[in-house]
């Protein structure tokens, strides 16, 4: 009929299925809500990267000055506590008495007399001489550090450049406390005795002698080699021109020490072929030989 709705031809789904579909549709929404809610009820804060509050205009130059940043950061509110240090009271030094009163006998001498403890010098210099002051940082020669060149080791063959034995080759034994080197020829080979020499005036060669087993006497020190002053003879009546100067003579102790050291080194030198002739020969420069180009 006119004015009436046409009957719905679509089939209606059962109610059970509709209810099930409503429950399934409500589950993801509930899950989404559960994810968004924080257990404490607050949203988690995002971690911000650490950066300065003073933006950089150019490399090394900030927008705000140091005083401006001091007020922006409110650094004036901070309380600084300095470490407490105990200050010990200085002990008063006892005053040293300059004078002493002494009793003096005699009726007319007054009974006492004031005497100075520190007496003034009896004689004074005719010219003013400035007093030498110890400078800070400078140590005496006895306290200097003794350094040895890396090329000089016990048993190294050295070439002496100065003195009466210049040009001769010797064997280095050890370094003394003064920094000088103790060397020997040996005496039988090149007539160089036990003596001291400075490492400045020596050329170290690559040739070495094994002296690890050699025992050097402990009394071979700087005092042992110190030159003794010869006494000047006093003139007597009638012997003005007949007096003779005292001459230096080698002691028996030196001769014994020389033999003791050389007897230990000689077998080791003879064991190496051509080493004996090398030590006996003298070093010299000829035409076309340049020291800075030579390999020792």
UniProtKB/Swiss-Prot annotation:
Biased composition (Low complexity): 17-28
One GO CC term, this protein: synapse
CDD domains according to UniProt: KOW_RPL6
Record PTM N6-acetyllysine, positions in chain: 247
Pfam families membership: Ribosomal_L6e (PF01159), Ribosomal_L6e_N (PF03868)
Glycyl lysine isopeptide (Lys-Gly) (interchain with G-Cter in SUMO2), cross-linked positions: 5
Protein name listed in UniProt: Large ribosomal subunit protein eL6
């Amino acid at each position: 009929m006119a004015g009436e709705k046409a009957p719905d031809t679509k089939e209606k789904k059962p109610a059970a299925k509709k209810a099930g579909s409503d429950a399934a549709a409500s589950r993801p929404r509930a899950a989404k809500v559960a994810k968004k809610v924080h257990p404490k009820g607050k949203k988690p804060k995002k971690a911000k990267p650490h950066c300065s509050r003073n933006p950089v205009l150019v490399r090394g130059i900030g927008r705000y000055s140091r005083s401006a940043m001091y007020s922006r950061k409110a650094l004036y509110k901070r309380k600084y506590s300095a470490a407490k240090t105990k200050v010990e009271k200085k002990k008063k030094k006892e005053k040293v008495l300059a004078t002493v009163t002494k009793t003096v006998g005699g009726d007319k001498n007054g009974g006492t007399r004031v005497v100075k403890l520190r007496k003034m010098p009896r004689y004074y210099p005719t010219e003013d001489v400035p007093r030498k002051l110890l400078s800070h940082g400078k140590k005496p020669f006895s306290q200097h550090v003794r350094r040895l060149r890396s090329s000089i080791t016990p048993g190294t063959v050295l070439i002496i450049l100065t003195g009466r034995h210049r040009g001769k080759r010797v064997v280095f034994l050890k370094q003394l406390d003064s920094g000088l080197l103790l060397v020997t020829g040996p005496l039988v080979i090149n007539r160089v005795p036990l003596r001291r020499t400075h490492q400045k005036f020596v050329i170290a060669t690559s040739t070495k002698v094994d002296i690890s087993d050699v025992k050097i006497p402990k009394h071979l020190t700087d005092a042992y080699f110190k030159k003794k002053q010869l006494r000047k003879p006093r003139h007597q009546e009638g012997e003005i021109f007949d007096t003779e100067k005292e001459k230096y003579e080698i002691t028996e102790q030196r001769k014994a020490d020389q033999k003791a050291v050389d007897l230990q080194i000689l077998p080791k030198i003879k064991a190496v072929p051509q080493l004996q002739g090398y030590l006996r020969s003298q070093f010299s420069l000829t035409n076309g030989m340049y020291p800075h180009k030579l390999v020792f």
